[in-house]
Design a protein with these regions (language model features):
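A conserved ligand/cofactor-binding region detector
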Residues: 1-424
Length: 424
């Protein structure tokens, strides 16, 4: 049903979205971008630089799909993307990005809205704005003379209509607004403030990169690929849906793993092998299985979404892994993107034993968390797939000691500045 609605709406909405670049578009996308050894199966680029890439796309023998996207979109719509609780996500953090790099990145890759509409009541504009900003309005708001505004824009190198005394929305943001915001950003940096405070100033103009994995995308497409949604998230959902319905998933069997950023190949016997490329471009094969290096490398790669360059070297992987799992508090979200098919979606016999009998939870595979009213077995948010996170002991804290933690936090430099509750 959702696929049919997407196809019905696609021509109308594409006029507003205007896809600018599609890799391997037209028909099923069977080959990865950049060849069979690329970490990306397919990629599509839309207006204003919104991007969707498929990192891994798998289907079980029973036909249940799981897909991992790498997305880039304006941070302004991130809260709306995050409302979809059936999808697991990791996102780049302003707290992890050096300030100078953030400033340069925002100036070079400013995040703009996909569509500009005129103001009216309600959440959605229905009439297109021409995108021109009146220099007289700028002068009036800032209490400048128009000549002062004109001279500033000339000095900044901005293109604008001097005769008509107007400037495009994008150039206004880039040359007027960001000239002030980035200057303030640098002032705060040079004053010694931490990037977790300073970088927040630039978030409205920043692209965010996210890793999104799920087995259930119908509701996301249904809510976000329709005309009442924010135009920028319509664009994002459109790109994702295009790839989802036009890319051929890789079939995986029980005990074979969906591993974003870790590549697969089968030998003549049909056995699946896992590998990554080192800096020299050579294949480095990784052990498979639940406790293998392929799973570990994939999880750590997903955790590197804030990094400028993916690093799957053993040294980097070990450092990231230790930060995620060996620091006393488990940061489990990066382990949510790796999964393997359930041995069966219903009761079956495996190695002479009854497995996954719906009414007998003790027969369920490790990692299965619940059954829905239709009798489908789930592992957290994944239907028909075992999420690796659910195989990690203590991945979810169920015995938080507030009084103990309160003492630990209050004794730190930052904690000493918080509201001290309960007598310390």
């Amino acid at each position: 049903m959702i696929k049919r609605l997407l196809l019905q709406h696609s021509l109308r909405l594409l006029r507003g979205c205007d896809l600018t670049e599609i890799y391997l578009g037209g028909g099923l996308i069977k080959n990865p971008v950049g060849g069979h050894d690329s970490v990306y199966r397919a990629e599509v680029v839309g207006k204003t630089g919104v991007k969707a890439k498929i990192v891994a796309y798998s289907v079980s023998k029973s036909g249940q799909r799981i897909v991992t996207f790498e997305l880039e979109y304006p941070r302004t719509i991130h809260s709306e993307v995050r409302t979809h609780c059936m999808l697991d996500m990791n996102a780049s953090s302003s707290r992890a990005i050096p300030m100078k790099f953030m400033r340069d990145h925002v100036l070079e890759n400013t995040a703009f809205p996909v569509v500009l509409t005129k103001n009216q009541s309600g959440m959605q504009g229905r009439e297109l704005h021409d995108g021109w900003i009146d220099l007289n309005v700028i002068a009036d708001v800032y209490k400048h003379k128009v000549k002062t505004v004109v001279n500033f824009l000339k000095g900044s190198g901005a293109e604008f209509d001097e005769e008509g005394l107007r400037i495009s929305f994008n150039n206004y943001i880039k040359y007027w607004v960001l000239s002030a915001v980035t200057a303030d950003h640098e002032v705060l940096e040079r004053s010694g403030l931490h990037k977790q405070v300073v970088n927040r100033l630039l978030e409205p103009y920043q692209y965010i990169k996210t890793i999104v994995t799920g087995t259930e995308f119908d509701n996301f497409f249904n809510l976000r690929f329709q005309e009442d949604a924010d135009p920028t998230i319509i664009e994002l959902a459109n790109l994702m849906a295009y790839l989802y319905y036009n890319t051929e998933p890789e079939e995986l069997s029980w005990k074979e793993w969906h591993t974003p950023y870790v590549l697969h190949e089968r030998d003549v016997s049909g056995k699946l092998h896992y590998f990554v490329r080192n800096e020299a471009g050579e294949k480095e094969y990784l052990s498979g299985g639940r406790d293998g290096d392929a799973v570990k490398v994939s999880c750590c790669a997903c955790a590197q979404v804030s990094y400028r360059k993916l690093d799957t070297s053993p040294e980097k992987v070990q450092r990231v892994y230790d930060l995620l799992i060996n620091g006393g508090i488990i940061h489990g979200s990066a382990f949510s993107h790796v999964a393997c098919p359930m041995c069966s979606m219903s009761a079956s016999i495996v190695d002479g034993e009854s497995v996954n009998m719906p009414v007998l939870p003790k027969t369920w595979q490790d990692g299965i968390t619940h059954m829905d009213r239709q009798g489908n077995l789930w592992s957290s948010k994944f239907k028909g797939w075992i999420q690796y996170r659910k195989l990690i002991p203590n991945e979810n804290c169920v015995s938080f000691d507030y009084e103990k933690r309160k003492q630990e936090v209050y004794s730190t430099v930052v904690g000493s500045q918080l509201t001290q509750l309960g007598g310390g």
